[in-house]
């Protein structure tokens, strides 16, 4: 068992890699200069949605979510939902690994992608098979350094920031603002993972704690988005594949120390390590596979399949289109609808017991 603080760090580290890095170019593509407004408006909606997650947690009584569904609604409802969640988690892990191999191709262009994929998979496998405690402990050790580096790059780049680039506000009306909201939403709704992990949490979860995690997730999305706009301008930032990490290229210490962007590699690796470990751990966990040998076999097969898919000759443009137009919008809408469905199930179950 782990406590809520540890799980919160895992969720922040996992969701941070998508909201801090992956969604920002797509958000800038659709909302441009007003991307930061999209995040602020969405964050207000997000704070309203978080109590829905808490209500589901409260009335499932810290039981395994899918055990609760099976007990109350049977396999006819539970198995289709479980299948969709498992498929979503597999795609999520594959997308994360694919993005990682693309990012590392900038730094290690001559290194075979399969080698990088296998090395990362081996490290993640070792972490996953040791359980949620291992994932939580490694996150607690690695993530604070990521936060420190984030504050460092923010402070170091103050001389390069021009906040006048945030204006004019809503030059093209509300339409671009609304279009961009779907991308940070894809990361925000991953807070629902707390329900998949609730049977591993030994401490009581409070609504205020979930709201604090939500505010942190909103902050780590808003900060780099504003930074990209004020440092590069909305048009240049939108043309960059990873504007968050391009910010590291601006960092220098005095006259003689620069090219510190290698530190971004640590940030990325930590985020990906946490995210892949969490996502792949959840698959046998939601399937309630208890035997360690069977769990290890499932984890191994999943990681091997992910590496094979990631080294297929798929262009980055096609992959970017898939993320932007298919996966992220479906993820955001799908997880939101899933949370609403759980809320309905909880309400019906509660009224049945009263009757």
Swiss-Prot record:
Example GO CC term: the record gives:
plasma membrane
Q: Where in the cell is it found?
A: Cell membrane
Q: Which organism is it from?
A: Bacillus anthracis
Spell out the family assignment given in the record's similarity comment: Belongs to the amino acid-polyamine-organocation (APC) superfamily. Spore germination protein (SGP) (TC 2.A.3.9) family.
Name of the featured protein: Spore germination protein XB
Q: What is its main location?
A: membrane
- Pfam families for the chain: Spore_permease
Q: Which NCBIfam families match?
A: 2A0309
Q: Where are the transmembrane segments?
A: 2-24, 34-56, 69-91, 106-128, 135-157, 180-197, 210-232, 265-287, 299-321, 326-348
Q: What is the lineage of its organism?
A: Bacteria, Bacillati, Bacillota, Bacilli, Bacillales
InterPro entries per the record? Spore_GerAB
Keywords associated with the record = Amino-acid transport, Cell membrane, Germination, Membrane, Plasmid, Transmembrane, Transmembrane helix, Transport, Virulence
Mode of membrane association: Multi-pass membrane protein
Free-text function comment from the UniProt entry: May allow B.anthracis to germinate within phagocytic cells and therefore involved in virulence.
Tell me the superkingdom of the source: Bacteria
Its GO biological process terms? amino acid transport; spore germination
